[in-house]
Amino acid sequence: MQQTNLLIGTSAGVYELTGDGPRQDPALGSREVTALAAADGVAWAIADRRSIVRRGSDGTWTDVARSDEFDLVCLLPMPDGLLVGTDEAHLLRLDDHTLGRVAPFDAVEGRDAWYTPWGGPPAVRSIARDLGGRIHANVHVGGIPRSLDGGARWEPTIDIDADVHQVVAHPSEPDVVLAAGAVGLAVSENGGASWRIEQQGLHATYARAVAVAGDTILLSVSNGPRGGRAALYRTTHDLQLEKCTDELPEWFDGNID
């Protein structure tokens, strides 16, 4: 079987990028795939916003569980199972083909103050586990609650109005956690206990997505929720943020998620 280098979720199924180029994986057909995650040779996906599907090492996709109550948003494979973030800002854990609520997350301090700018319910947009084992759940809009004990207890971190859109854990620095928010790039060097905001070098502060590639942090920024003058930034050798320009347009119209 050709080695898969990248899986791409779309509104009409999953595409694989291999050494031979992209091709659609026929196993999921035209099902909408809104989230992907991988660990230990297994890929996970959210299909049709309600189903969890798993891709084994042989490339076969299998439906594992379905949520009848909430739309599913994001995935985090864990050593002891799979965590799933949902609309209405809940966490679910996959246990023997059943999705059950992580009840302590529903009781985290400050939950009553979570909101969205348009008045709808908040959502868990992304989840990350750092190399120290701490779990960080990005709520939009509700900060980044974290757990030090695998999800048994949760505590709030970062100001809610930082309006965080994504949280990621650094793949090689145990205590470094990064977040993209409406205030810029949020950086924690102590596993989420405290945060600082980096804005220097950015043309605007509204950050939508963050990723780490080797020693480089990548950040997308725009004028606001509706996009406009969106651009990609990267950190330099001295950790300053600079705009990426080679082979890219000066600005993107929409937000880069």
Label each region the model flagged.
Residues 1-257:
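Extracellular glycan-interacting surfaces
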